Design a protein with these regions (language model features):
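Short phosphate/oxyanion-binding micro-motifs
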Residues: 1-152, 156
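Short, well-ordered beta-to-alpha junction loops that form the rim of enzyme active sites
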Residues: 160-163
Length: 164
């Protein structure tokens, strides 16, 4: 999914970029997205990776605060509200968003414009240790595929809940 208007830069020698990760356990509650946006502002975070979003399908939501939530969950709205990842972007960082891809319910990638090199952020939510071996292997194969597709010159940030 590509954003049409060309962005400002996310990262430059003069700007500090603050990135965070939060396993929020669910965003399937009224007002939860607004609460997350307030916490981002409180700590001055520009890009916040979210695990266990528990929203179905994939999409982009702009909040009344100006923050933008990119999310990826199970493909069918009839599925249980489980897993899911997201990236909450500040008003400043959304301007530099070039494109994003909801790879599956556990991996989401976003690419940002920066001063010298583009920045690719990969948000992950790995299966837990008690998950079956096939689920774990599928996750890591998908993650490797995402990293293989990432432009080699990009600054790549892999973050999330790795469930070690």
């Amino acid at each position: 999914m590509t954003q049409r208007n060309l962005p400002t830069t996310l990262l430059s020698p003069k700007n500090v970029l603050r990135i965070g990760v939060w396993n929020i356990r669910t965003m399937y509650q009224t007002g939860r997205a607004a609460q997350v946006a307030r916490e981002m502002d409180r700590y001055g975070i520009h890009v916040l990776g979210l695990s266990e979003v528990r929203w179905t399908t994939a999409g982009k939501v702009t909040l009344s605060s100006g923050h933008t939530l990119l999310f990826s969950g199970p493909p069918d709205e009839g599925d249980a509200h489980r897993n899911g990842v997201g990236l909450m972007l500040s008003r400043q960082s959304v301007k530099s968003l070039m494109e994003w891809e909801p790879d599956n319910e556990r991996i989401l990638t976003a690419r940002f414009k920066s001063k010298f090199q583009e920045v690719t952020v990969v948000q992950c939510y790995a299966p837990t240790n008690v998950a079956d071996q096939e689920s774990k292997e599928d996750f890591y194969e998908c993650l490797q595929g995402v990293l293989d597709r990432t432009p080699k010159r990009d600054i790549t940030i892999v973050m999330g809940n790795m469930n070690a």
